[in-house]
Amino acid sequence: FGGYSVYYLAGHHDKRFKCFIAHDGIFNTQQQYYETEEMWFPNWDLGAGPWRKGISADPDNAEKVNDQQKVNPFTTSPHLYVDRWDTPILCIHGEKDYRILSSQGQSAFSAAVMRGIPAELLLYPDENHWVLKPQNGILWQRTFFRWLDRWLKK
């Protein structure tokens, strides 16, 4: 949930952060629900599909939960809070990540650019959710620290 958390925090941080870095994060939970090839995790993590009005926060005891205790995780999707984004963001994603498609990172990057927020997209055509190739790892480290140097030294 690291990348998801970064995208969510970008809309809820009240100027506590000078920049953000999101790696393979979920930007739009509804889009993610439909575009992943792995159907078990979205149902487990989110409780059910976006068509459900209320989802139990405890799937094992769903029948014991009343309507006031139900939540809809799709209402906390980071993309719904882009209007609050105001902080530079670096989005990193691997195009061979079939669980969280690169369109999530590309969408977050595009949202930031359209809002006039400084943003950068580091897209690996040959990596999945993990950066495994040594040369790509070096690029990841250099980009990561260059981004921090740029925004934290101001």
Language-model features, listed with the residues they occupy:
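Active-site-proximal cap/loop segments of hydrolase catalytic domains
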Residues: F1-K154
